[in-house]
Structures are given as structure tokens and as C-alpha cells.
Amino acid sequence: MDMKKLMKQMQQAQVAAGKIQDELAAQSVEGTASGLVTVQMNGHGKVTSLKIKPEAVDGDDVEALEDLILAAINDAAEKAEGLQREATAGLGLPGF
């Protein structure tokens, strides 16, 4: 294979990957648990917002609130992973 052609393809892939990273950072997904806890996350999976309704807070049952928070985070993380899969689907790279 021609080295110049290979280098050009690598540069194009780097530009495309940079664009994808920017797009993922700008996108947002939301995960919820029983409507009591809501988590927003960007396309990279970084939590950007956490909302807890007052009725979710029970001093005698902190474990239930912890479970709701985890469920909301995991729900949002699944959606963020979906965005990542969609964004990288056209690259044809294994593991992306």
C-alpha cells in the first residue's frame, strides 16, 4: 500500500474522530428511576446533572435513594453508550 495514501487516510480518520468527540460532548441523554431521580449525562458518559425529588428522600431508608441514584445513572450510561455506538458505526473500526 502507498504510504502517502495510508498517511492521508490516517489523517482523515483523526479528523473524523475529533468531530465525533465534539458531537458526543454536545449531546445529552437522560436517565430516570421511578420518576424520583433524574440524571443527565453527555455523550461521553459524564454526569452533568442530578435531580432528586423531595419525596425520594427518606432518612430512614437511605439505601432506597442510593438504589434510585444508581439506577438513574446506569439508565443514562446505557443511552450514552448507544450514542457512542451510533457515532462510531460508520468508522468500521473494531471495538467502536
Curated annotation (Swiss-Prot):
Q: Which residues, if any, are the signal sequence?
A: none
Q: Which family is it part of?
A: Belongs to the YbaB/EbfC family.
* NCBIfam families (UniProt xref): DNA_YbaB_EbfC
Protein's UniProt name: Nucleoid-associated protein DR_0199
Q: Which HAMAP family match?
A: DNA_YbaB_EbfC (MF_00274)
What cystine linkages occur within this chain?
A: none
Annotated Gene Ontology cellular components are: bacterial nucleoid; cytosol
- One of the record's GO molecular function terms: DNA binding
- Tell me if NAD is a UniProt keyword of this record: no
Which residue ranges run through the membrane? none
DNA-binding is among the record's keywords:
yes
Q: What happens when the gene is disrupted?
A: Mutants display an increased sensitivity to oxidative stress, and a slightly increased sensitivity to ionizing radiation and UV exposure.
Q: How does it assemble?
A: Homodimer.
Q: Where in the cell is it found?
A: Cytoplasm, Nucleoid
Q: Which InterPro entries match?
A: YbaB-like_sf, YbaB/EbfC
Tell me the keywords, alphabetical order: Cytoplasm, DNA-binding
**Top-level lineage group:** Bacteria
Q: What job does this protein perform?
A: Binds to DNA and alters its conformation. May be involved in regulation of gene expression, nucleoid organization and DNA protection.
